[in-house]
Design a protein with these regions (language model features):
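Glycine-rich FAD pyrophosphate-binding loop
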Residues: 29-53
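Conserved flavin/dinucleotide-binding core of flavoenzymes
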Residues: 4-5, 315-423
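Helical element adjacent to the flavin cofactor pocket in flavoenzyme catalytic cores
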Residues: 189-237, 246-249
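Mobile amphipathic helical/loop "lid" adjacent to a hydrophobic cofactor/ligand pocket
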Residues: 72-73, 77, 82-182, 197-198
Length: 423
């Protein structure tokens, strides 16, 4: 129930207008609390942003929205986002050609093609089906309580062959986790597997940046302050780089873990490391695929991890019908001629049509995802409270849009509870 809002009531100050900060703000707004959302950048969204270059929509790194996310879906108007779905499966390059591996439960017509594809063995495909049944039959709460180990150890424990792990899981989940060693938490693997199994990987028709923009539209215009850097915090105020000090009833840090460590040095050692990715954009006269599907490098060679023609999912990513192609390379690769090397490599995948591709932009994303190893410290509350200051973000839950949204919600709930107990 929405409580009465007093215009004179001190606001909750939220530092960081990414997905976690926006989630916190929307829940506080719904409960009738005043808020002030401050971000150092020129727009909301944090890592979930979309730029425009020569009329093309360029997400900051290849990202998808999983429409099975329960908490995020409850906050969004998914119909208004006009979500465009990818095919449930992938094309895997085995060193010679692309082979189709689909979710046969959702694409039964592909059962024979997938079963006979030289990606793992037939027993591996049966094990995928068994794993799917078991994970989809588990609740998220049950998954969160399971023994945690690396994803590689988990997959080996389920009996998957080395060929299946190396050819499919390393490339597909390498693109999700931004690491191909599969050292990511098995709980995170099961969570992600469940979300893919229950729904679809999608893109908002107008870019991933539409997701945070929709959340920001729920807030009063005067509650959001952009292009202002916070340089110090305490439990009741923040100080901007301009010297201005803003007072509030509570302070929430919804920044990435690097900024958390700068503003709260006592937490720096507890913040996770970051995984990085290099994302290249090309435009072309036409798509090399002509279907909305992700292509994976299962060959174990080359630098490319995954490729996707975004315009096959949403033609709105292009201003004029040309194809927009996203290529992900794990890690940071600042070489000037990287795009040339990538095109040369992808000629082995798609043939001579790659010669017609034009390089549009390369993004070096050093802080793409927080580390998610089994040993990564996660607060059971989904957020951290340090010396009276609240800290939220996907680093405190799971490295995903859903994780960020949940963390922001839990901080909001804690602040609302504190306010009610003070009445």
């Amino acid at each position: 129930m929405m409580s009465h809002r007093s215009s004179s009531e001190a606001p909750v100050i939220i530092v960081g207008a990414g997905m976690s900060g926006l989630s916190c703000a929307v829940h506080l707004q719904a409960a009738g609390l005043n808020l002030r959302l401050i971000d150092s950048s020129d727009g909301v969204g944090g890592r979930v942003r979309t730029d425009v270059a020569d009329g093309f929509l360029l997400d900051r790194g290849f990202q998808v929205y999983l429409d099975a996310y329960p908490e995020t879906g409850a906050l969004l108007d998914l119909k208004a986002l006009d979500l465009r779905k990818f095919e449930p499966g992938a094309l895997v390059f085995n060193g010679k050609r692309l082979k189709r591996l689909m979710d046969v439960f959702r694409r039964p017509a592909s059962a024979w093609t997938s079963a006979t594809a030289p990606i793992g063995g037939f027993i591996d495909k049966l094990r995928v089906g068994l794993m799917r049944t078991q994970i989809l039959g588990s609740t998220l709460e049950q998954i969160a309580k399971r023994e945690d180990r690396t994803t590689e150890s988990y997959l080996r424990g389920r009996g998957f062959s080395k060929a299946m792990i190396d050819t499919f899981f390393r490339s597909f989940y390498g693109g999700i986790f931004l690491e191909s060693e599969l050292r990511t938490s098995s709980r995170m693997f099961e969570f992600t597997f469940k979300m893919f199994g229950q729904g679809s990987a999608t893109l908002p028709a107008k870019g991933m940046g539409e997701i945070p923009r929709q959340l920001a539209a729920k807030l009063p215009l005067d509650s959001i302050t952009l292009n202002q850097k916070v340089v110090s915090v305490d439990p009741r105020s923040v100080t901007l780089s301009s010297g201005e000090r803003i007072h509030g009833r509570a302070v929430v840090l919804a920044t990435n873990s690097v900024v958390v460590g700068e503003l709260l040095p006592e937490l720096k050692s507890e913040m996770p490391e970051w995984r990085s990715v290099t994302n290249l954009y090309f435009y072309a006269p036409s798509s090399p695929l002509e279907e909305p599907i992700i292509c994976l490098n299962g060959s174990g060679e080359g630098v490319v991890n995954n490729v996707c023609a975004l315009t096959d999912a949403s033609p709105d990513y292009s201003p004029d019908g040309r194809a927009l192609i996203s290529v992900s390379v794990l890690g940071l690769h600042p070489e000037r001629d990287l795009h040339g090397k990538v095109q040369q490599e992808l000629m082995g995948w798609f043939g001579e049509c790659v010669e017609e591709w034009s390089h549009l932009r390369t993004d070096l994303i050093s802080e793409a995802l927080p580390e998610q190893a089994p040993s990564a410290k996660k607060d059971k509350a989904g957020f951290i409270q340090q010396n009276g200051i609240y800290v939220c973000g996907d680093h405190a839950t799971s490295a995903s849009i859903e994780g960020a949204v949940i963390s922001g919600k839990r901080v909001a709930e804690a602040i609302i509870k504190m306010r009610l107990s003070a009445v």
